[in-house]
């Protein structure tokens, strides 16, 4: 049995935040592998399923990010699992958008969710760091991670989440380099496809059928002789 934990903050107002990309990864895995419905347990939401023949417990702590360790620690103690059975998915500002890295152990890197988990159970577990980019200045970090992904971000975020879900079996089997390669190829492939799209020709603005009919008609020719011609000359004068 393995535990996959996706980190984030509970509630609709945080759902699309960069800080919640761990929740998004957990949701993508649950959908892709037809996990059980989410249920409340261990101060979080859990779903159960099987990947590559291994039973997986997905957990999304509902304690808010800074207390994630309470939920994750409770789950590991309940199932009597070692730290090596845990994989945590979370946002990483020190990675460019769309980049993904895996490592086991190490420091929290300023991430409060990871700091909480380290404090409760230790740090010898696998981390899947999902790059969300850095705002450039330290004072803007909180605003950045608690801000929503922009519409343009879906160009790399959606293929990355799909790749995480599609290739989760590689994590189960311990093929970390293969998993990172698949994720990178998915994001690069999407970017290349966008660049190779033929430029769309600008369509002429639609005109009403009346204007179209008018534009197709030859300009009316004014009469040069007769009563009508005489009347027009009185109205507008003789242009000769």
Curated annotation (Swiss-Prot):
Q: Which reaction does it catalyse?
A: an N-acyl-L-alpha-aminoacyl-tRNA + H2O = an N-acyl-L-amino acid + a tRNA + H(+)
Which Pfam families does the UniProt entry name for this protein?
Pept_tRNA_hydro
E.C. designation(s): 3.1.1.29
Record region (Disordered)? 196-227
Q: Which UniProt keywords apply?
A: Cytoplasm, Hydrolase, RNA-binding, tRNA-binding
* A single cellular component GO annotation: cytoplasm
**Where in the sequence is the active site?**
19 (proton acceptor)
* Locations listed in the record: Cytoplasm
- Key word Hydrolase present: yes
UniProt site positions, description: Discriminates between blocked and unblocked aminoacyl-tRNA: 9
| Biased composition, class Polar residues, residue ranges | 209-218
Specify which residues bind tRNA according to the UniProt entry for this protein.
14, 64, 66, 112
Q: SUPFAM superfamilies from the xrefs?
A: Peptidyl-tRNA hydrolase-like
Top-rank EC class of the record's enzyme = hydrolase
GO BP annotations, alphabetical order: protein quality control for misfolded or incompletely synthesized proteins; rescue of stalled ribosome
One example of the protein's molecular function in GO is: tRNA binding
Q: Which parts of the sequence are marked as the site Stabilizes the basic form of H active site to accept a proton?
A: 91
Q: What quaternary arrangement does the UniProt entry report?
A: Monomer.
| Similarity annotation | Belongs to the PTH family.
Q: Provide the function of this protein.
A: Hydrolyzes ribosome-free peptidyl-tRNAs (with 1 or more amino acids incorporated), which drop off the ribosome during protein synthesis, or as a result of ribosome stalling. Catalyzes the release of premature peptidyl moieties from peptidyl-tRNA molecules trapped in stalled 50S ribosomal subunits, and thus maintains levels of free tRNAs and 50S ribosomes.
Q: Which HAMAP family match?
A: Pept_tRNA_hydro_bact
The name on file for this protein is Peptidyl-tRNA hydrolase
This chain's source organism reads: Mesorhizobium japonicum (strain LMG 29417 / CECT 9101 / MAFF 303099)
UniProt lists the gene as pth
């Amino acid at each position: 049995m393995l535990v996959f934990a996706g980190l984030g903050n509970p509630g609709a107002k945080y759902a699309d935040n960069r800080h919640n990309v761990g929740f998004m990864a957990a949701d993508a895995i649950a959908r892709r592998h037809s996990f059980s419905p989410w249920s409340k347990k261990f101060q979080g939401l859990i779903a159960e399923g099987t990947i590559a023949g291994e039973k997986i417990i997905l957990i999304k702590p509902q304690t808010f990010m800074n207390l994630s360790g309470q939920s994750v620690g409770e789950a590991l103690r309940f199932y009597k699992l070692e730290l090596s059975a845990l994989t945590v998915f979370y946002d990483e500002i020190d990675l460019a958008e769309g980049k993904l890295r895996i490592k086991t152990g190490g420091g929290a890197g300023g991430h409060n969710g990871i700091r909480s988990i380290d404090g409760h159970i230790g740090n010898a577990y696998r981390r899947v760091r999902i790059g969300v980019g850095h705002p450039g200045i330290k004072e803007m970090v909180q605003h950045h991670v608690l801000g929503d992904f922009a519409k343009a971000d879906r160009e790399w975020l959606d293929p990355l989440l799909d790749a995480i879900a599609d290739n989760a079996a590689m994590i189960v089997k311990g093929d970390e380099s293969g998993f990172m390669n698949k994720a990178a190829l998915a994001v690069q492939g999407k970017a290349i496809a966008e660049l190779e799209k033929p430029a769309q020709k600008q369509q002429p603005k639609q005109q009403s059928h009346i204007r179209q009919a008018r534009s197709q008609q030859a300009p009316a020719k004014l009469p040069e002789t007769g009563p009508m011609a005489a009347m027009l000359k009185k109205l507008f004068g003789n242009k000769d």
